[in-house]
């Protein structure tokens, strides 16, 4: 086996740190079970891919694409998701500053209006998926966009993800039941804008 298997990243906070917005029960299941399953399935697909490449089995290589896209996307999306959240008493919900705030105000007028639009995009996801704040390097602009299932933003659109809102039911159902909007309205309280600003600065400086 020539590939290095992926592993579950540690959370930068305790499982109960995002309460009352997200319960510890949800966080444990979401991280230890759901994210881990994506990683397990991704590694299994990569092992098959490694064998298929060795055997030059083109049919198998093509057949593996859906599993790589779904489980690889699940790992990419969740790894970013954990990093862009923070407990309320550790800066969660504190608005961004500097260039990122200026760009948000340029495209959406105010921070409050941006959050309203973000919630609208997330609420509009049919079934399971993600709502994203992304940066388009080609146009040097911020965008709000949804992706279905576990489709990752960057490989499919060329836009770089800054913030992702998980609107799969496993992200909220145990606490909010079928009222997705209550989850979305509470979500801005735990956005880690400090981390997102750092990520944005790294993107800008590398282009």
From Swiss-Prot:
Binds 1 Mn(2+) ion per subunit. It catalyses: 2 superoxide + 2 H(+) = H2O2 + O2. PROSITE patterns: SOD_MN. SUPFAM superfamilies: Fe,Mn superoxide dismutase (SOD), C-terminal domain (SSF54719), Fe,Mn superoxide dismutase (SOD), N-terminal domain (SSF46609). Keywords: Manganese, Metal-binding, Oxidoreductase. It holds the Pfam family Sod_Fe_N. Belongs to the iron/manganese superoxide dismutase family. This is Superoxide dismutase [Mn]. The lineage of its organism: Bacteria, Pseudomonadati, Chlamydiota, Chlamydiia, Chlamydiales. The gene is sodA.
């Amino acid at each position: 086996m020539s590939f290095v298997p992926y592993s579950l990243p540690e959370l930068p906070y305790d499982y109960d740190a995002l309460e009352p917005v997200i319960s510890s029960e949800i966080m444990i299941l979401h991280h230890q079970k759901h994210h881990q399953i994506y990683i397990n399935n991704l590694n299994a697909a990569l092992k098959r891919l490694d064998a298929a490449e060795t055997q030059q089995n083109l049919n198998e290589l093509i057949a593996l694409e859906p599993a790589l896209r779904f489980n690889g996307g699940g790992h990419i999306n969740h790894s970013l998701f954990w990093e862009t959240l923070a407990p309320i008493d550790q800066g969660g919900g504190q608005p961004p500053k500097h260039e990122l705030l200026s760009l948000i105000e340029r495209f959406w007028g105010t921070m409050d209006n941006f959050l309203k639009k973000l919630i609208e995009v997330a609420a509009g996801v049919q079934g399971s998926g993600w709502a994203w704040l992304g940066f388009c390097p080609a146009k040097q602009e911020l965008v709000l966009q949804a992706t279905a299932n576990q489709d990752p933003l960057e490989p499919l659109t060329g836009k770089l993800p800054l913030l992702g809102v998980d609107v799969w039911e496993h992200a909220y159902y145990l606490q909010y039941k079928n009222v997705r909007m209550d989850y979305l309205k509470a979500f801005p309280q735990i956005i880690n804008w400090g981390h997102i600003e750092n990520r944005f600065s790294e993107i800008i400086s590398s282009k």
